[in-house]
Amino acid sequence: MGWNSWAAYANKINDHRYLGSAAFMRDTLVPQGFGNRKVIYINLDAFWSNLDAVQLSDAVATIKAMRGADGTRFEPGIYWTPFAYWSDNLDAYVEGTNMKYRYRDILLKAPDGSLIPKVDGGWAIDPSHPGAKARTTYYLQQFQKLGFQYLKIDFLSHGSLEGVHFDPAVQTGIEAYNLGMKQIVDETGGRMFLSLSIAPLFPSGYGHARRLSCDTKGHISGGDQSTEYMLNSLTYGWWTSKNLYITDPDHVVLGDKADLGARSVVEGKSRLLSAIISGGMILDSSRLADDSQAQELAQGVYGNRSWLSVAAEDKTFRPIEGDTGDRATDAFVRPSAHGVYVALFNYDEKHPQAITIPFDRIDKTLVSDPSISVVDVATGATLQQGHTDFSVKLSPSESTLLELRWK
């Protein structure tokens, strides 16, 4: 659990906002129960270069010195794109190469020697080029020297693009990707938590976590970057959790001033619950340093210890129904100590929705049984139920976490 700068501040991040967000987590959210195993990651995303060398070093030292009242420690995280270059200054010298190579040298080439066109605005770097390898060594050494414990590596698919590679033994994009990722794993040596983003699903084994979908913010619906968008990925990708990676559901975004932040506690709780059921990896990305609305929403959204306790179990839910096309299912389930947890979502921003779940869709062995109780995890209240099913009415954008108990 922790905080990420991207949706909150993007290219406006600075050391005051970075440290201020960490301080709010320490002083306000941690006492409410936010955190997992008494560790909070405070992560810089893109545009961390807004901080000069002294500011970056001082900020990292400050984060590492932070302690919550309960002993929770704080660890810094950072962001990097090892296989993508974002500038059009192709004559710039490559870091770590002692001016031996310029960026145009290390970019992936077409058979005629021209550069492979940009993808998503970035040039593809050839992982097999010695200049690219030196660049990787340079950045990883700098990150580890500063004391970063968490590394989000983004746009990794750039390293798997097809082209003519510097090393003639590398004949495919995936061979190049394997080469580049192996270097990262070898040179971090288990000393950093590696979270992969925009990365091939296979080959796996090169990171601890992998983004389940792409960027996700705080709105319940509306297409890309919504809670439903991310849960569509969980609907069809739940099986990757712990089999390939820890599933990363991206950040929880609260408040109007952040990018597509949740506009209410109800909507924010739905985004939080979507992260909880995706394995419990929760990174807030709200303007906690300087936005009173985001601070108020955060206290309301992260204020239920029972929900956070479920998140701390680090287990992923499965969809009850799996034939939903390009939409997410609205009901997810996983075993609990007393039966099963069930998470339900209303993706409609304007209308309430009643959801009815037959017991035998959850477990074929469940039949009409008066000993089954349906409990709201957040409040502990017991809900009424039918003989063969239970129904819940959700307000617009609302979600709920229930436990069916029979053990």
Q: Whereabouts are the PLM-identified features?
A:
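Glycan-recognition surfaces
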Residues: 101-130, 134, 185-291
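Catalytic domains of carbohydrate-active enzymes, especially glycoside hydrolases
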Residues: 17-47, 143-147
